[in-house]
């Protein structure tokens, strides 16, 4: 077909650049030792940070809800899809995040898009970090407000942008709490300080911080002891289930319920997923020394920058040949020249697993003349 010829040309461009992707078949529960495409591998790229996705207590909670509510919600929350489990989980999230209320979305992606496409108005401006997640970028694109991008966690540049945007009616500073490709933590205390000085609102996507940062895992707010206006999050990482949420004031949540299209027109996540997530809330430098460029703060994400996309793919293939699954991260997920192996450490990994990982990185790095 004519369309296939055109699409194949576009796919060939991706292949030549080393950024063509394909799917891998993961067999079994999301634990470190998994069978991938028929090969036994140790997985180092999962977001199951606390090991809860395979926790028996979550599975039991989901099974009990499945027996009572069935496999799907069969409607949007505003029609027939709302259940006691959705409401219980929202109350649990609000309590955990120390906000007045929370609202569930089908994913963290849809939560960001829903908030940013509905809340800021035409006379407003969104100030967005340069390395914010794709869902924030897409939400900004769909918003009626203008968008101004500031340099990654550069507070001087953010302040300059705040000075330059004082003509707008309202300003929203939007940032990841933990940046998923670098593992760096946003200086949220400094952002809150600037927001107060310049009368701006702060929206934080805590997808990779919830359950990980802070003394009780409440995220960047607890880590820094500050309170942003709005917190976005996901249930698919440390919480171990599926779905996303927005948390803030009761008025804000009422607004989203009536205006966020990604909430109004979505089928609600299954009650069983809500029950499992509710249970999850109830449970509560060697690489650098080798000579690798290692980014990241005190989070489970450890990005090891290789640089060239083709070499990164080769590195990932050699890892897999040694029984280690850590896929190559390439453009457009990261900038050109920033291709990397993104390692995520989970509570299910043993010290023996970590030792094996380090030894393998050392040998492959030497073989490919990276270190």
Swiss-Prot record:
Residue sites binding pyridoxal 5'-phosphate per the record: 108-109, 180, 205-208, 234-237
Domain of life assignment: Bacteria
Cofactor(s) this protein cannot do without: pyridoxal 5'-phosphate
EC code: 2.3.1.47
InterPro entries the UniProt entry points to: Aminotrans_II_pyridoxalP_BS, Aminotransferase_I/II_large, AON_synthase_class-II, AONS_Archaea/Proteobacteria, PyrdxlP-dep_Trfase, PyrdxlP-dep_Trfase_major, PyrdxlP-dep_Trfase_small
Keywords attached to this entry: Biotin biosynthesis, Pyridoxal phosphate, Transferase
Post-translational modification N6-(pyridoxal phosphate)lysine, affected residues: 237
Pathway(s) annotated for this protein in UniProt: Cofactor biosynthesis; biotin biosynthesis
Binding locations of substrate: 21, 133, 333
Record GO biological process: biotin biosynthetic process
UniProt cross-references to Pfam families, sorted A to Z: Aminotran_1_2
Gene Ontology MF terms: 8-amino-7-oxononanoate synthase activity; pyridoxal phosphate binding
Catalytic activity entry: 6-carboxyhexanoyl-[ACP] + L-alanine + H(+) = (8S)-8-amino-7-oxononanoate + holo-[ACP] + CO2
PANTHER family listed in its UniProt record: CLASS II AMINOTRANSFERASE/8-AMINO-7-OXONONANOATE SYNTHASE (PTHR13693), LD36009P (PTHR13693:SF3)
Subunit structure: Homodimer.
Stated family: Belongs to the class-II pyridoxal-phosphate-dependent aminotransferase family. BioF subfamily.
Record function comment: Catalyzes the decarboxylative condensation of pimeloyl-[acyl-carrier protein] and L-alanine to produce 8-amino-7-oxononanoate (AON), [acyl-carrier protein], and carbon dioxide.
Protein's name according to its UniProt entry: Putative 8-amino-7-oxononanoate synthase
Organism listed in the record: Bacillus subtilis subsp. natto
Taxonomy of the source species: Bacteria, Bacillati, Bacillota, Bacilli, Bacillales
